Swiss-Prot record:
Keywords annotated in UniProt: Ribonucleoprotein, Ribosomal protein
Function: Involved in the binding of tRNA to the ribosomes.
Disulfide bond residue pairs: none
Subunit structure: Part of the 30S ribosomal subunit.
Xref: Gene3D superfamilies: Ribosomal protein S10 domain
Species: Buchnera aphidicola subsp. Baizongia pistaciae (strain Bp)
GO cellular component, one term: ribonucleoprotein complex
GO molecular function, one term: structural constituent of ribosome
Ribosomal protein in keyword set: yes
Gene: rpsJ
Protein name: Small ribosomal subunit protein uS10
Any single GO BP term: translation
HAMAP family for the chain: Ribosomal_uS10
Length: 104
């Protein structure tokens, strides 16, 4: 790969255990192939709250509240080798994790 190349990986998941497991797999794979890793950097958790009326008609005071938390992590791989890219492409991550990869 070119000099001063870097791979930025952003991970999103609802379950923090899944995202931590996936992050550790990516970091281990990158370090094993000789790349320099920065991170994982925990980004702010997005909390989305929903309020639902329990009663179908009256009793406006009776409500339930639900919340969805989206956990995010950022990993920078500095000066990746060809081995690093191949190993990351073959890596199988959990189904509940959204992965965005950008080259910079």
């Amino acid at each position: 790969m070119q000099q001063n190349q870097r791979i930025r990986i952003r991970l999103k998941a609802f379950d923090h255990r899944l995202i931590d497991q996936s992050t550790s797999e990516i970091v281990e794979t990158a370090k094993r192939t000789g790349a320099q890793v920065r991170g994982p950097i925990p980004l702010p958790t997005h909390k989305e709250k929903f309020t639902v009326l329990i009663s179908p008609h009256v009793n406006k005071d009776a409500r339930d509240q639900y919340e969805i938390r989206t956990h995010k992590r950022l990993i920078d791989i500095v000066e990746p080798t060809e081995k690093t890219v191949d190993a990351l492409m073959r890596l199988d991550l959990a189904a509940g994790v959204d992965v965005q990869i950008s080259l910079g």
